[in-house]
Amino acid sequence: EILYMMKEVQIQKQLSYIYITHDLSTAKYFADRIAVMYLGSIVEIGEANEIIENPKHPYTKALISAVPDASTGRANIIKELPIKGEIPNASNIPTGCRFHPRCIYAKNECQNTETMLKDINSSHKSACIFFNNI
């Protein structure tokens, strides 16, 4: 009910929100665009629908799969996409891709390559060097 009221006020007052959450299904409700952050860096950014329907970073994919959605069959994805290990200490951020210690797609180059946002299309970017395989 609170989310409904926030959306109503957003429309009536033509407001923008900075909405911080791990539940991307609620972010999609408010947002035209979504930026996903991991350990203080944006790892994926794009149109809300595209981020939810076609995630191109393993962390984004894991966040989406963590929220069961029976209508799309996402209830079982979390079993297929586990996140390994523990969250690294923010004062000792891993080299290369910040997500590589927990990523099931990680390869050796992920430990050594500083990831930058790369264009997937004109409005969607990912910091994963293997975004084509996700």
Describe the role of every protein-language-model region.
Residues 1-76:
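P-loop NTP-binding/switch modules centered on Walker-like glycine-rich loops
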